[in-house]
Swiss-Prot record:
Alphabetical UniProt keywords: NAD, Oxidoreductase
UniProt name for this protein: Inositol 2-dehydrogenase 1
Transmembrane in keyword set: no
Reactions mediated catalytically: myo-inositol + NAD(+) = scyllo-inosose + NADH + H(+)
EC number(s) recorded for this UniProt protein: 1.1.1.18
GO biological process terms on file: inositol catabolic process
Organism from which the protein derives: Saccharopolyspora erythraea (strain ATCC 11635 / DSM 40517 / JCM 4748 / NBRC 13426 / NCIMB 8594 / NRRL 2338)
InterPro entries tied to this protein: Gfo-Idh-MocA_inositol_DH (IPR050424), Gfo/Idh/MocA-like_OxRdtase_C (IPR004104), Gfo/Idh/MocA-like_OxRdtase_N (IPR000683), MI/DCI_dehydrogenase (IPR023794), NAD(P)-bd_dom_sf (IPR036291)
Gene3D superfamilies: Dihydrodipicolinate Reductase, domain 2, NAD(P)-binding Rossmann-like Domain
Quaternary structure annotation from Swiss-Prot or TrEMBL: Homotetramer.
Length: 337
C-alpha cells in the first residue's frame, strides 16, 4: 500500500519533510501541500511533482479524500487546531514538536484522541529514532550498565535565530531532552530546577544563556541538562547514561577524522537538520509504515503533552531557582501504563 501524504507547512522543516518523503521513504507519496505563504507552498509542491496539489486552506488538505495521512509542520500556534482536525477526520498525523503551544492545548488533543478511541497522533520527537539514542536505550534495557543513577545531557546550538524568545530554550530546545529522557528511562520527570549561569556576551539581551537544568524522575534518577543556544562553534548534542555497573554515551556523529598539520579533528554539524537527518528519515519511515498498517507508533499525544508540561514547569522554576513539581493529568488507558 502506498500512503498518500499531505504536508501542512512548507518552511524549513516542512520542505525538508517533503523532500525526505519523496526521495527517502518507501511506501509514501506526497500528494498535497499547504502553506499560508502561497508562493512558497506552490514552489514546494512543484518541486515534489506535477501531480502534487496545493491547498491554500490546510483544513481543505486534511479533508481531501485523496490524502491518507498528514504531516503538520506549520507554526506552533496552529498545531492544536490542525492535529485535532486530523483526529476528527480519522487520519494519522505526524505533528512537529511542540505538539501544541501549551500543555493545556496538548491535553485537549489527548482528549479528542481518547474520544476517538484510537491513536492517530505521533509527536515529532525524532531523537527516539536516532540510531545512537536507540543503541543507548537498548544497552540500558538489556542491563548492560545496571540500573541508571544519573543522566548528563548537553544541547548546544550555534546561535539563536532572531525570533528566539526567552521561553524557547525550554519549549523549543530542551523539550527534546525532556522527551528523550522520559523515553530512555521509562519514567516521568516529576521535579525541575533551573539554575541561572553567567550569561554569554553572545546572547541577545533578552536571553539568559546558557541555562543549567536539573530534572528528577519518578524513579529517583537525577538528570542535568545544559542548554546553550549561542554556543557559536556549531550544533552539539550529547547524552551519557550512568548506571550502577557502567556508562553508555552517544557516539560522535561523524564519519571521517581529519589528521593534518599536527592535529586531529572531526567536523561539527552546523544545525540539527544535518545532525539528525537520518533520525528524521527513520521517523517518517516508521510513521508511514504504521499508517499503512492502520496503526500508530513513536511518541504519542500523551508524550507531547508530558514534554510540554515539563517545559512549562521549567518556565516557573526559572523565576527564583527553587524546585518546581511537574503536574500531570491522569494518563488515559489508551496510552498504556
Amino acid at each position: 500500500m502506498t500512503v498518500r501524504v499531505g504536508v501542512v507547512g512548507t518552511g524549513v522543516m516542512g520542505a525538508d519533510h517533503v523532500r525526505t518523503l519523496t526521495g527517502g521513504v518507501a511506501g509514501a507519496r506526497v500528494v498535497a501541500v499547504s502553506d499560508a505563504d502561497q508562493g512558497r507552498g506552490r514552489a514546494v509542491a512543484a518541486e515534489a511533482g506535477d501531480e502534487v496539489v496545493f491547498h491554500a486552506d490546510p483544513v481543505d488538505l486534511i479533508g481531501d479524500a485523496g490524502v491518507d495521512a498528514v504531516v503538520v509542520a506549520s507554526p506552533d500556534h496552529t498545531h492544536e487546531a490542525l492535529a485535532t482536525a486530523c483526529v476528527e477526520a480519522g487520519k494519522p498525523v505526524l505533528c512537529e514538536k511542540p505538539l501544541a503551544a501549551t500543555a493545556a492545548d496538548c491535553l485537549r488533543i489527548v482528549a479528542h484522541e481518547v474520544a476517538k478511541g484510537r491513536r492517530l497522533v505521533q509527536a515529532g520527537y525524532m531523537r527516539r529514532f536516532d540510531p545512537s539514542y536507540v543503541d543507548m536505550k537498548r544497552a540500558l534495557d538489556a542491563g548492560s550498565i545496571g540500573d541508571p543513577v544519573l543522566v548528563h545531557c548537553v544541547h548546544r546550538n550555534a546561535r539563536a535565530l532572531h525570533f528566539f524568545t526567552p521561553e524557547m530554550p525550554f519549549t523549543s530546545a530542551a523539550v527534546h531532552e525532556f522527551d528523550v529522557v522520559r523515553w530512555l528511562l521509562s519514567s516521568e520527570i516529576v521535579r525541575v530546577t533551573v539554575h541561572r549561569t553567567r550569561s554569554s556576551s553572545r546572547a541577545a539581551a533578552r536571553l539568559a544563556d546558557p541555562r543549567l537544568l536539573v530534572l528528577e524522575t519518578a524513579a529517583g534518577v537525577t538528570v542535568d541538562v545544559e542548554v546553550f543556544v549561542n554556543a557559536q562553534y556549531g550544533y552539539d548534542v550529547r547524552c551519557e547514561l550512568v548506571g550502577e555497573l557502567g556508562t553508555v554515551s552517544l557516539a560522535l556523529p561523524s564519519t571521517t577524522v581529519v589528521r593534518a598539520g599536527g592535529a586531529e579533528g572531526v567536523a561539527v554539524h552546523a544545525d540539527f537538520r544535518t545532525r539528525f537527518a537520518e533520525a528524521y528519515r527513520l521517523q517518517l519511515q516508521a510513521w508511514v509504515d504504521a499508517a499503512a498498517r492502520g496503526e500508530a507508533c513513536g511518541p504519542s499525544a500523551w508524550d507531547g503533552y508530558a514534554a510540554t508540561a515539563v517545559a512549562e514547569a521549567c518556565l516557573r522554576a526559572q523565576e527564583d531557582g527553587t524546585p518546581v513539581e511537574v503536574e500531570l493529568a491522569d494518563k488515559p488507558a489508551l496510552y498504556g501504563t
